[in-house]
């Protein structure tokens, strides 16, 4: 198939292609880095259980909603709400999703650049080029941060210019199996090391006394970010779906892939932390586990250096390659959302749209590269608050504007007997009551 260069909408070549692309959007640093470190710092197996419940009971219903809106409209998040309703407010909701995606991508690419740099640091450290290795691990060096972020953005732009099937789908079909293979290989190695089983027990044996309201809302926020909800990515990906596809089934596959890889990442990172502890590397600060950033960018590299030799270098390179692949799969979907908006609403062909939007985001990324203190504020505004707000308003759109009858009419494509199914009885309850209430409470809790 030729590369998509016109303003015509693309489509997925296969069901597997969509599942891998949507799962690739979901499986990013939030799964490989964020989820394991939150499990480790906020409740162990108790957090894992709450996260799984939030993902299936809140994340999955919203995912079905986003995909159905996308496929019914065949448009980007802004255009989707224009097509499906005359309501003037909800296109602004779609625009908010586009803005959130752009701003998340702007700081995400800086963090992704750190991971990419650390992969080379391991090689330079092994070769004795210590000064170069220290430069690559100095997150306070703005020029280095900017260079790595630009490299990451250029790779993302290049993939997006290829279109839906030849760019996004082809890239994720390669990266997802590679990602899973790397995780499993590293798990097998880590499990042979002293201290690993202590980490496994911490991860898999629940202590329900550690469940608190804060833990529940942290797990809910993690589920939202992990599944790429609320920013329009799944509306955009849904707009490329064939009418013959069963959306609830596809959403279930994507959710299972997301939690499955998050679980595997936890099975790698948490035992690795305790292997580091067994090797004499301090993983606690006082009574508290070190921060997530320290765990990934200080403690694990120290472990690889302690192992030393070819094995230590290989593990370090492979681990940070894993983070880089996970990040790239997410930056693809984050950039596709505003690119789709420009293509649909402004009728600019894909290649020009990708470069125009991509370079705009890159400029913001470079600013953040020199002011990394902005990352925390941007993450709070556009991720911690922005994504749940988007998800809440999507629920309200289906409940009060588009109505469930229209939603079910769309879902009947690919699932002809949906109105007779258990899903038809349960989904509206979650989408109208449980999901909005839980999400709203989560948003409010950020201000209390």
Q: What do these predicted regions represent?
A:
Residues 1-34, 62-67, 71-84, 88-95, ...:
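Membrane-interface "cap" regions at the ends of multi-pass membrane proteins
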Residues 2-8, 12, 16, 169, ...:
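Membrane-embedded translocation segments of transport machinery
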Residues 6-9, 37-42, 77-96, 109-167, ...:
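Inter-helical loop and helix-membrane interface segments of multi-pass membrane transporters/permeases
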Residues 14-54, 233-235, 249-252, 256-259:
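Transmembrane helix-boundary motif of multi-pass solute transporters/channels
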Residues 371-397, 419-448:
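A generic transmembrane alpha-helix motif of multi-pass inner-membrane proteins
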Residues 324-334, 354-364, 382-411:
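Hydrophobic alpha-helical segments of multi-pass membrane transport proteins
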Residues 34-51, 70, 85-86, 114, ...:
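Transmembrane helix-loop boundary segments of multi-pass membrane transporters
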Residues 17-19, 25, 142-147, 257-263, ...:
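Loop-to-transmembrane helix boundary motifs in multi-pass membrane proteins
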């Amino acid at each position: 198939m030729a590369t998509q260069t016109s303003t015509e909408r693309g489509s997925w070549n296969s069901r597997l292609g969509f599942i891998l692309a949507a799962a690739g959007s979901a499986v990013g640093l939030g799964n490989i880095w964020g989820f394991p470190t939150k499990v480790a710092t906020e409740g162990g197996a108790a957090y894992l259980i709450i996260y799984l419940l939030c993902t299936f009971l809140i994340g999955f219903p919203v995912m079905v909603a986003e995909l159905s809106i996308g496929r019914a409209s065949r448009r980007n998040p802004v255009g989707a709400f224009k097509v499906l309703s005359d309501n003037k407010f909800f296109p602004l909701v779609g625009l908010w999703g586009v803005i959130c995606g752009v701003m998340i991508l702007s700081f995400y690419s800086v963090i992704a650049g750190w991971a990419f740099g650390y992969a080379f640091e391991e090689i330079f450290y092994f070769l004795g080029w210590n000064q170069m290795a220290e430069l690559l691990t100095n997150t306070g060096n703005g020029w280095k941060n900017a260079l790595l972020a630009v490299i990451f953005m250029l790779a993302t732009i290049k993939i997006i210019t290829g279109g839906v099937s030849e760019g996004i789908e082809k890239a994720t079909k390669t990266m997802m199996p590679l990602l899973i293979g790397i995780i499993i290989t590293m798990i097998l190695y880590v499990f042979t090391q002293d201290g690993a089983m202590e980490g496994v027990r911490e991860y898999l044996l629940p202590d329900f006394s550690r469940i608190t309201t804060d833990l529940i809302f942290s797990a809910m926020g993690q589920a939202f970010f992990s599944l790429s909800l609320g920013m329009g990515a799944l509306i955009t990906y849904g707009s490329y779906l064939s009418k013959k596809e069963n959306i609830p089934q596809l959403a279930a596959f994507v959710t299972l892939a997301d939690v499955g890889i998050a679980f595997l990442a936890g099975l790698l990172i948490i035992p690795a932390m305790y292997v580091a502890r067994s090797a004499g590397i301090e993983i606690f600060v006082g009574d508290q586990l070190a921060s997530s950033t320290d765990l990934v960018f200080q403690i694990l590299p120290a472990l690889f250096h302690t192992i030393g030799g070819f094995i230590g270098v290989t593990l370090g390179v492979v681990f940070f390659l894993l983070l880089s692949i996970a990040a790239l799969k997410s930056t693809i979907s984050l950039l596709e959302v505003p690119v789709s908006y420009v293509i649909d609403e402004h009728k600019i062909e894909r290649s020009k749209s990708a470069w125009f939007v991509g370079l705009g985001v890159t400029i913001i990324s470079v600013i953040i590269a020199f002011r990394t203190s902005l990352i925390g504020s941007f993450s709070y505004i556009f991720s911690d608050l922005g994504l749940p707000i988007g998800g809440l308003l999507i629920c309200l759109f289906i409940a009060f504007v588009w109505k469930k009858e229209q939603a079910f009419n769309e879902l009947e494509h690919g699932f002809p007997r949906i109105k007779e199914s258990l899903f038809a009885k349960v989904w509206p309850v979650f989408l109208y009551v449980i999901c909005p209430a839980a999400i709203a409470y989560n948003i409010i809790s950020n201000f209390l």
